[in-house]
Amino acid sequence: MAANLWLILGLLASHSSDLAAVREAPPTAVTTPIQNLHIDPAHYTLSWDPAPGADITTGAFCRKGRDIFVWADPGLARCSFQSLSLCHVTNFTVFLGKDRAVAGSIQFPPDDDGDHEAAAQDLRCWVHEGQLSCQWERGPKATGDVHYRMFWRDVRLGPAHNRECPHYHSLDVNTAGPAPHGGHEGCTLDLDTVLGSTPNSPDLVPQVTITVNGSGRAGPVPCMDNTVDLQRAEVLAPPTLTVECNGSEAHARWVARNRFHHGLLGYTLQVNQSSRSEPQEYNVSIPHFWVPNAGAISFRVKSRSEVYPRKLSSWSEAWGLVCPPEVMPVKTALVTSVATVLGAGLVAAGLLLWWRKSLLYRLCPPIPRLRLPLAGEMVVWEPALEDCEVTPVTDA
């Protein structure tokens, strides 16, 4: 009995020591193939360092928020983006391998615990006839003293290049320059002034970053920003149409009024001609059109984007005109008449000669030539011996 008791106590002591060893064992370190993940807002890059001994030769790619995946720069431990928001907290993730294993993630910019519901909301922008216009709504928790200011810059440049929009407006007040109250709910920027008036120039800015800042007596409120692709945001304007008659022909030509679709437009032309019961539509790629023998006719035209096929302009103003019928000059008419008469005379003479020859042929048919065959009909005469007596004659 005593021996059994000592055996039980020994087993319990051994189990307790094993549990203590388990509790005292250091936790297993979780290792990742990358470390020191960080954002460079000046160059729009997400960089990292490979962990010691990590094999990341299988390829890396990144993702900003819910955007499409971006491959890492060749030979470098970083991904480059076209833009980075300095206002929205965005999650950046690095993936490795074909199975898209998550290697690390980071948020940028760090959340400053500001009241984001006081920031401007629903920022939207569009381009029309050389002007960039943006509108926003006041934050639902913005106090009455909060006012907003809009800045813009080339997306390829950093925040140090921000420039303020000069022409603010609100729902009920239009004013140039900063308004003295918090009524800013939009702003318009003349792109021809700040970018130059030459479309498709080498210095053409393809995208801009729009930032709306807010501030009140309690201090600044979080900002709102957005990257605007100027070509995508451009609202197509109807072309400027002119028409004229060139004799009996009608000539229509037009000029597009879109800055960021230079050379990337097609056109739909509608022609309403009095000689036709229904208007005719033509899809053309060149900015002019000819109609022969036009008569009473009218034109209108609209643009369509070759980049975004669903993007169309409205119809231009319809222009009508009446072109005179085609009139042949007197000299040309005389020459044509003479040529017609001569041609008819030659045809008649030819027919007469043919008729006379045909009649003579029927009245006096030609006598066929006789061909006397020689072979088989000839008689060959051969000399024969004389059978008469010949008496010689002598002189007396």
Curated annotation (Swiss-Prot):
There is a cross-link at residue 357 (Glycyl lysine isopeptide (Lys-Gly) (interchain with G-Cter in ubiquitin)). Gene3D superfamilies: 2.60.40.3850, Immunoglobulins (2.60.40.10). GO terms for molecular function: cytokine receptor activity; interleukin-3 binding; interleukin-3 receptor activity. Glycans are attached at residues 91, 213, 246, 272, 283. The chain crosses the membrane at residues 332-355. The keyword Zinc does not apply. A motif (WSXWS motif) lies at residues 312-316. Keywords: Cell membrane, Disulfide bond, Glycoprotein, Isopeptide bond, Membrane, Receptor, Signal, Transmembrane, Transmembrane helix, Ubl conjugation. InterPro entries: FN3_sf (IPR036116), Ig-like_fold (IPR013783), Short_hematopoietin_rcpt_2_CS (IPR003532), TypeI_recpt_CBD (IPR015321). Residues 1-16 form the signal peptide. It holds the Pfam family IL6Ra-bind. Residues 17-331 are extracellular. Belongs to the type I cytokine receptor family. Type 5 subfamily. This is Interleukin-3 receptor subunit alpha. It comes from Mus musculus (Mouse). The gene is Il3ra.
